[in-house]
Amino acid sequence: MYQWNLPYRKDDVETGVSSRRPLLYPAMHENPELRWGFIRKVYSIIAFQLLATVAVAATVVTVRPIALFFATTGLGLALYIVIIITPLIVLCPLYYYHQKHPVNYLLLGIFTLALAFVVGLTCAFTNGKVILESVILTSVVVLSLTLYTFWAARKGYDFNFLGPFLFGALTVLIFFALIQILFPLGRVSVMIYGCLVSIIFCGYIVYDTDNLIKRHTYDEYIWAAVSLYLDIINLFLYLLTVLRALQR
């Protein structure tokens, strides 16, 4: 495995890197080619996860008996609860084994398929127009924030300070979501809650992309991909929540 602090000099002939090659950020002390290779690998994994999510979700939406089984039977409800908690359970061993091949890929597959099933069941009872709007909006936001973060990193900006604030805000909203199970929110409150959580995950996209550019070691490609994949999926689901509330 490559090491994080691999030295890099603009005039290093052994690395084969031209002195004219731009750095990803001003204080970069590693070979840009290695970091770009790592970034491409992470985004390739994310692309595979998203394609798998689309395939599974599309199957659940189009094959109506699947969604009806989960919605109308006791066994289906029990399985749905298991599927919901599976990604949370798998995250623990995935974090521990994210550098252990091939266990990391196996756990990543289980995690992705379980979350894809959750997305599919959520979309199965949602208007197609709302789903399309959510997909388009999520794509635009993710692309815009990713490009902005790469541009900001090149200019010398750092977003590591966002970590504690995002974690604190997300913790508060998670407890708020647990409370609303006992005391359901109205339509306006659901919209406000969905917007707030969407903003938080926009912040997480910037934060995790900044970590991808500067901080993740080269053997942390699985965890880097999982972090950004979770940001994208959660952003989509909460934008979907907001748009569904608007249609009521």
UniProtKB/Swiss-Prot annotation:
Pfam family, one: Bax1-I
Membrane topology: Multi-pass membrane protein
UniProt superkingdom: Eukaryota
Record keyword RNA-binding present: no
A biological-process GO annotation: cellular response to unfolded protein
Location, primary (coarse class): membrane
Cell compartment(s), UniProt: Membrane
Matches recorded under PANTHER family: BAX INHIBITOR-RELATED, PROTEIN LIFEGUARD 3
Protein name: Protein LIFEGUARD 3
Organism: Arabidopsis thaliana
